Amino acid sequence: MFELRKLPYDTNAFGDFLSAETFSYHHGKHHNTYVTNLNNLIKDTEFAGKDLVSIIKTSNGGVFNNAAQVYNHDFYFDCIKPSTGCGCGGSCQSIDANLQAALEKEFGSLENFKAEFIKGATGVFGSGWFWLVYNTKNQKLEFVGTSNAATPITEDKVPLLVVDVWEHAYYVDHRNARPAYLEKFYAHINWEFVAKAYEWALKEGMGSVSFYANELHPVK
């Protein structure tokens, strides 16, 4: 059975990006509901005792939706970090040299990467996610937009960064202003986590996805 992961930071430490109230609903209620639903759906089925990624890749319907949303939310919450308090909007953050070189090779510059990321995430219609992934088939970085619970790991693409654009992720703090939320998100990206995800993607490919998920949700 799966458990709701603990967040690795103080939910009061995100300034005007996200409030503790948002975390209480997003993590404490929405994310928790996906975990609870998944446990109820897989009990006494062929999915009981399987690891999270295996369930995602071999299921459909309600089981898939809830399993994928557990993973998607886990990853999103690791992609953000608290405010630095410097007021720079994230410009003072250092990015791993290998990751920066890969981003500049694929997108031209970090400025262009940011512009394309925010444009792509703004353009996701309705509820969904916007990802930076490592494509294991062509060994390139690319953007992927997914709707509802869909996740790129079903296409053998390794997530490196994701932003949640379901309205419950930002409505308490930003109402319907998704672009404003995305600007704040970019200033709170946990680049150390993204760099580590990229490093493991290069070393282990899709195996890195299972390693990450199993660290949070060991099979019991």
Curated annotation (Swiss-Prot):
InterPro entries: Mn/Fe_SOD, Mn/Fe_SOD_BS, Mn/Fe_SOD_C, Mn/Fe_SOD_N, Mn/Fe_SOD_N_sf, SOD_C_sf. GO terms for molecular function: metal ion binding; superoxide dismutase activity. Belongs to the iron/manganese superoxide dismutase family. It comes from the Bacteria. This is Superoxide dismutase [Fe]. Binds 1 Fe cation per subunit. Destroys superoxide anion radicals which are normally produced within the cells and which are toxic to biological systems. It catalyses: 2 superoxide + 2 H(+) = H2O2 + O2. Homodimer. Fe cation binds at H26, H73, D164, H168. Keywords: Iron, Metal-binding, Oxidoreductase. The keyword Metal-binding applies. Its cofactor is Fe cation. It comes from Campylobacter jejuni subsp. jejuni serotype O:2 (strain ATCC 700819 / NCTC 11168).
